[in-house]
Amino acid sequence: MNTTLRRDADEIICSSIQAVLPDKAVCRALENFQPRGGRVLLVAAGKAAWQMAHAAVQALGRVDGGVVVTKYGHVKGRIPGVNCYEAGHPVPDANGFAATEKALALVQGLTAEDTVLFLLSGGGSALFEKPLVPGGELQDITNQLLASGADIVEMNTIRKRLSAVKGGRFAQHCAPARVFSIVLSDILGDPLDMIASGPAVPDSSACAQALAIAEKYHLNLSEQAKALLAQETPKALDNVTTQITGSVRELCTAAAKACRELGYESILLTDRLCCEAREAGSFLGAIARTHAGQGKKLAFIAGGETVVHLTGKGLGGRNQELALAAAPALAGQNAAVFSVGSDGTDGPTDAAGGYVDGETEAALRAAGRDVYRTLADNDAYHALQAVGGLIRTGATGTNVNDVAVALVE
């Protein structure tokens, strides 16, 4: 392993994530928060829910009650006046269903003088859920979507119609109270109704789109689920104010700044990366190989969210798969590619992403690993683990997509 490039990669990752932690962003958004005089209740859902709720309560001083539902391992302590719950992600589970019921109970019977402060971040689609189909069926549909290669907008178009809280329905539960929503974006282009499936946003998608997506990916659905896909979601809400804060562009900007501080010339390729993970990795590897050996320190940055079409039975995540796919192009070069999820988790693993450099492919061969067979089995985790290429950050408290960087010396 090229220890110099790995050290630079770790520093860039740390600086980038620190720049997009939600604490300051939530406080800025609350400058426009003006309760009407009644009760103020807090509901937070998503991978960054605890961090956002903690910042909000510190800024406000107190709330009259609250519920946080976040991913396992993401609650970092007690928040005064708020009950915190952990649940399953990316597949919803019974703990998430129960926590959502607690949130719904909290907002029942409110008046027009009351306010619900709704803090939303990526991961909310799985974590904040009251299914309209049996829980086991929803889990099965979620697994089908995850394995299909469907993008997040397609997935959430389906999930909205199978839920009693998504697609604007949570805001309807809160009425006549006002909902003040602060959203940390994890979807390219910041479509509010798709982030965590838009529990407090009118739905822009149509039932015809949902039915087409189900057909496109050959989803195995019950008659009940098919009937729900054919029903429309709320198209207008009059009790919601929404502010978006944080995005993948901020993550990319922070990464570029960190690269410059380490002496690299930074080039932002895109903040809308959306393709197969291994295609993105091969592309970044090819860019790095083209520019290696020219005597210039360069950093090529891409932010977004790739997808993985599961065909194998291995372990990994989109960022690990992206990194591993870059390894062949980097072989023998003084260059590296790394990719991380800003939330600190990549797929169903304990890693945030992966790192490879010009020495990785040879190290994999020595360990009895073939890059292409490993990718075909979707087993990037074990391959990178064998050569020290896993990136572990732990839960970060934020969630604004992924960032991938190619470094050239």
Model-derived regions, located:
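Glycine-rich oxoanion-binding loops at beta->alpha junctions
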Residues: T70-A112, E154, I158-R159
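Short beta-strand segments
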Residues: V43-A45, V67-T70, L117-G122, S181-I187, ...
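Active-site segments that bind and position negatively charged phosphate/pyrophosphate groups
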Residues: G263-S339, G347-P348
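A glycine- and small-aliphatic-rich helix-loop capping segment at beta-alpha/alpha-beta transitions
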Residues: A55-G65, I79-C84, L104, Q108, ...
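Internal helix-turn-beta structural module
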Residues: L324-E409
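Internal gly/pro-rich beta-alpha loop/helix module
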Residues: P134-N220
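Accessory alpha-helical/coil subdomains and C-terminal extensions
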Residues: A177-F180, P202-F283, I287
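An N-terminal, well-structured beta->alpha segment
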Residues: M1-V43, Q51-M52
